[in-house]
From Swiss-Prot:
First and last residue of the signal peptide: none
DNA-binding region coordinates: 142-161
InterPro entries in the cross-refs: Arc_TR_HTH (IPR020886), Cro/C1-type_HTH (IPR001387), Lambda_DNA-bd_dom_sf (IPR010982)
Lineage: superkingdom: Archaea
Name of the molecule in the record: Putative HTH-type transcriptional regulatory protein PH1808
This protein's record includes keyword DNA-binding: yes
Source species of the chain: Pyrococcus horikoshii (strain ATCC 700860 / DSM 12428 / JCM 9974 / NBRC 100139 / OT-3)
Length: 315
């Protein structure tokens, strides 16, 4: 299955299970699909080979997920070494990766994955508190239970503290010993975004000038390299995000990017704006295109947001 076929296949799954979707046709983008259902928002990258996912794409995807309180996911079919298996969670640069089958099972059948692939094989996460309670209830010392399992005391202590994943073999032995389920499902929707840095390093002089002006207006700016927009501009007081594009001049590519920004803004409940060095003011699919000179005359964030709203309303 080629990448475009995979994107369409994944989108079909999401639509069947009640998601509203937007497909991003942008070469090299950090995501291919935005999907929303009730309060859940997903940014999904679909790749036949998940090893083609770059670290730069991963960093941008994590930034977007943190800014929009979304879940980032990589959906694929294989790695460079093997086919991906249903029910198993893989990981690339801190982004969980699953198969289309696992995606369907999670949402349509309520069956979250239980197994995580790490270097050396397949592992599970177990309920450490429950394990300790069962061990004490059955009268086993740490040394005795470790001996039964064929592992070290230190390993068992780490399992009870939830500090380590457990091999499938050991997990099965534990459940046989206690006749109780101990394996915890893996919540692939809960991404580890706490340490994600929301940087704003510009790629060129024009970006630098626009970013500096936006910050002077009282807005924060987060640089995104692998999307149809250049940055997310955030107005903190009212919690408003702007998908912000920047170009030297208006071209066909600018208009295509503006259309994609319009579609994404609608799905995520945001607004879009483009700042172009050489252009006249106009609106493309609800996305205002502002001459850079006009931006320079704006005095604060409220004035910019009001201008965007007025231009959208009049278009």
């Amino acid at each position: 299955m080629e990448r475009n076929e995979l994107v369409n296949f994944v989108e079909g799954i999401l639509k069947r299970i009640g998601f509203r979707t937007m497909k991003l046709e942008f070469r090299g983008g950090c995501f291919d699909l935005v999907a929303t259902r009730q309060l859940l928002l997903l940014f999904i990258k679909a790749l036949a080979n998940i090893d083609k996912f770059s670290e730069e794409q991963a960093e941008d995807l994590k930034k977007l997920a943190k800014l929009f309180k979304a879940s980032p996911l990589l959906v694929g079919l294989r790695s460079k070494n093997a086919e991906l298996e249903d029910g198993v969670v893989y990981e690339r640069f801190g982004i969980y990766a699953i198969t289309p089958g696992t995606l369907y099972s999670m949402f349509a059948e309520g069956e979250p994955p239980l197994i995580i692939a790490e270097r050396g094989g397949f592992y599970v996460r177990i309920d450490g508190k429950k394990l300790k309670a069962l061990r004490e209830e059955h009268g086993y010392s740490i040394t005795e239970l470790a001996g039964i399992l064929g592992i070290s005391r230190k390993s068992l202590q780490r399992y009870e503290k939830g500090e380590s994943v457990v091999s499938l073999e050991v997990a099965l032995r534990l459940e046989e010993v206690f006749d109780e389920p101990l394996v915890k499902p893996i919540d692939v929707l809960r991404a580890r975004l706490k340490d994600v840095t929301l940087t704003s390093e510009p790629d060129n002089i024009l970006e630098k000038e626009v970013f500096e002006k936006l910050r002077k207006l009282g807005m924060s700016v987060v640089k995104i390299k692998t999307a149809p927009f250049n940055a997310i501009t955030k107005e903190e007081e009212d919690d408003i995000e702007l998908l912000t594009g920047i170009d030297e001049r208006k071209t066909g590519r600018t208009l295509k990017r503006a259309e994609l920004v319009s579609q994404m803004a609608e799905v995520v409940g945001s607004d879009g704006v483009f700042v172009v060095k050489k252009a006249r003011m106009e609106v493309v699919r609800n996305v205002p295109i502002l001459p850079k000179k006009l931006l320079e005359e704006i005095k604060d964030a409220d004035e910019l947001l009001e201008l965007i709203r007025d231009l959208k309303f009049k278009s």
